[in-house]
Every structure is written in C-alpha cells, then in structure tokens.
Curated annotation (Swiss-Prot):
Keywords: Cell membrane, Membrane, Transmembrane, Transmembrane helix. It is a multi-pass membrane protein. This is UPF0056 membrane protein MJ1677. It comes from the Archaea. The chain crosses the membrane at residues 7-27, 49-69, 70-90, 112-132, 145-165, 185-205. InterPro entries: Multi_antbiot-R_MarC. It comes from Methanocaldococcus jannaschii (strain ATCC 43067 / DSM 2661 / JAL-1 / JCM 10045 / NBRC 100440). The keyword Cell membrane applies. It holds the Pfam family MarC. The keyword Transmembrane applies. It is found in: Cell membrane. GO terms for cellular component: plasma membrane.
C-alpha cells in the first residue's frame, strides 16, 4: 500500500466533493426542517452518494472495457472534465452544478437527499470520474483499498460538515466558503493537468 497514492486519491476526491461548497445548497433545501429531519437528510445524502461512487469505483473498469475505452483515453477525457470543473471552482461558478428547477422540485426528504444533494452535487460527473481513475490506476489490491478508504473518509468529513452546516456557515461565512472552494479548485486543477499529462504519456508510449 502506498501512502502517497492515498493522499493523491483523497485530495482529488475530497476537492471535487467540496463539502463546504455544498453547505449553502443544503441549508436552502432544509431550512424549513427541524434539526432531526435535517440530520436525516444529511445521513441519506451521504449514503446515496457513497453507493453511487463505490459502484462506479468498483465496476468502472468493466464499464470502460465494455465500451472499448482505454484507461489512457479515459484519463485524458476525465482530466479535461476535472479541469473544466476546477476552473469553475476557481472562478466561483461551481453553484451552476445545481439548477434552480432541481431545487424547486425537491420536496420530500428522500427526493432532496438523492437529487440534487447526493447527485449531482456530491456524486456528479467530476467525483465519479475521480473515483474511477483512482481505482483504475491502483497498482494492487492494497491501493484499491486505499481508494475506497479515501472515498469513505471524504464522505465522512462531508457528513460531519452537513450535520453542522449552519454552524459552518456562521463561522466562516459565504465569503469563507468561496475562498475554500477556490483553494480546492486550485488543487484540483493541478491534479487534472497531471491526469491529462499521464494519459497522453501513456497513449504515446
């Protein structure tokens, strides 16, 4: 098992999940709920997101093989996708991931937790891609376990953040959330560029 690989996988997945950026949307959707129901929404959101990300992480390689897509091609495409998302984060435009119609259509706890919170806010194209690439690049079973651990840790932190969403917003404010989002976007930009470089190098060699 490679600790450096775990750090890379965790950084990529956690940055794209960006739990702090999810706080304003979570508060908007659950503002009329009592604390107990808000906590239930947070729990179900993370469970749904975990199921989606694990499914693509574990079976993503077979999906690529089924469609005849090489890992290097997927790295390039995935890197470009992550780069576009990260640039939106740096420019403070990540909220475009959630459309107003999706927010207005979400009424019940299960509906809110699944859509738009679990997907596309948390388990969206970017985080799914990050998980699939991290798992596909794992050199052995130990590294694959580290990717799963990175997913669990990232969503664990996300769960704790959503549980204390109002406190987080009060403490760091919307400006603080924007700053954190931009910082995570910068980290993700570097990871995305490296992913593209690795994909091109692998395709040419």
């Amino acid at each position: 098992m490679d600790l450096q690989y775990f750090i890379l996988a965790f950084s990529s997945i956690f940055s794209i999940l960006n739990p702090f950026g999810a706080v304003p949307v979570f508060i908007t959707l659950t503002e009329s709920y009592p604390k107990k129901e808000r906590d239930l929404v947070a729990k179900k959101t993370v469970i749904y997101a975990l199921a989606i990300l694990l499914a693509f992480a574990l079976f993503g390689e077979w999906i690529l093989k089924f469609f005849g897509i090489s890992l290097d091609a997927f790295k390039i495409a995935g890197g470009i996708l992550l780069l576009l998302i990260s640039l939106d984060m740096v420019r403070g435009q990540q909220e475009a991931k959630i459309h107003r119609k999706e927010i207005e259509a979400a009424y019940e706890i299960d509906e809110i937790a699944l859509m738009p919170l679990a997907t596309p806010l948390l388990a969206g194209p970017g985080s799914i891609t990050a998980c699939m690439v991290a798992m596909a690049e794992a050199s052995d079973i130990g590294d694959k376990f580290l990717v799963i651990l990175a997913i669990l840790l990232s969503l664990g932190i996300t769960y704790l953040t959503l549980l204390s969403a109002e406190s987080v917003l009060d403490r760091i404010g919307r400006l603080g959330i924007r700053i954190l989002t931009r910082m995570m976007g910068l980290i993700l930009t570097a990871i995305a560029v490296q992913m593209i470089v690795n994909g091109i190098r692998g395709a040419l060699l």
